[in-house]
Amino acid sequence: MNLLYKSTRDAEKTVTASQAILKGLADDGGLFVPVSIPKLPVSLGELKEMTYQEIAYTVMKEFLTDFTEEELKSCIAKAYDSKFDTEEIAPLAKVEDAYYMELFHGATIAFKDMALSILPHLLTTSAKKNQVKNEIVILTATSGDTGKAALAGFADVEGTKIIVFYPKNGVSRVQELQMVTQKGDNTSVVAIHGNFDNAQSGVKAMFENKELEKELNEAGYQFSSANSINIGRLVPQVVYYVYAYAKLLQNEEIAEDEEINVVVPTGNFGNILAAYYAKNMGIPIAKLICASNENKVLYDFFQTGTYDRNREFVLTTSPSMDILISSNLERLIYKISGEDARKDTDLMTELKTKGSYAITGEMKANLADFAAGYATEDQVAKTIHDIYEDTGYVMDTHTAVAAMVYKAYREDSKDDRKTVIASTASPYKFAGSVMSAIDPKYKGQDDFKLIEELQKVSGTELPNAIKEIMNAEIRHNTECDVDQMEQTVKNILGVK
């Protein structure tokens, strides 16, 4: 059966999976969603014997129905290979009473690798399928991790260029170095004088600018997105929740059909939305627990039914979640409204004009699958410290947000289901924050010195991603103001 996609803001018009991947964002500013979420084509018991690559094919072929078996298997083989430092791709670590799904074993040691190692291949395959002659320009805003993972994925991929914008003082030193040292003739990195929301809004504005689209087309270019608004990012993320369940079955940690909970540190809502899709496919997930840092706009939304970004933006030690406009939430809003494109459009217009919106009581009742919590900066540091002291396991700041929220949820709800926590980045990526949580004496020390200390205390091997930036030369030093983003893109592409 052919699965088509439609915009959250227009129920009428449909496109194929490859067209949705190419476009990134729908013409009306909405996000592409499948007309229906497919069911898993195999039993849960059959999953447990499969490798990561086999589960990826089993899940993704249901969503990407216009890809041939050969095309999809080729994309998967190119993505999930020796770039990952473990054959399992996303191993589970049992620590205390939870299972940490380590999504940081890829090229840039963050969970974004899981989707961004395959997106370039899905995109170039989609371009061939749709006879696209233009060069594809990937335009991305990053709060730290997406940028590097996208750069690594697209570096020297034929027929593509990639331009990444990041907030000048809004990412960690390691994250910045990972980006500005990126090799590849088709890569560009730009620091903006502003925050992540400015970067994301600027990128979105360029996507929606018809005049710019025309100018680029005349020069032989067209935009696509590597941000989590692209369905080609979301579908590969569904895979690892299916895989986690399969691993628990294989390791006899759960019985077949036993329900589990999932906790996800959440910013842009893509990662937890993928878990929601896995649940809808038939994976027995009871609660989806949304973990926020002090930018707790999502926590407040789940508590009150009102989404309100009119608040102070807090810079925390978990920068990938320092987000007030959670763009993937729109896909959930659309679903809980009964797929009412008009209602979704009205709410998103309110968000744009007023900075807030409130959902109906009926819609709020459809959020029963979700629970939410948030962690303060002190709680994050204490969680890293306590779990290290008790078990020797070292986690990064984003994972600690989730661990703290899980602990509070478990105490409040008395829900003792087996729980998978999405561990979204390597502690090496945030060595400064992690080491000062373990012992305050490390506060303010040089990041690279702390990386060595972290290696000693954790007893883990230094990831390649860190070794690479130790001595790499800086290749990108462009900066611009928020209102110069469009001109900067034109300059990079040589468009007048």
What do the PLM-derived regions correspond to, one by one?
Residues M1-K496:
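PLP-dependent amino-acid enzyme catalytic core
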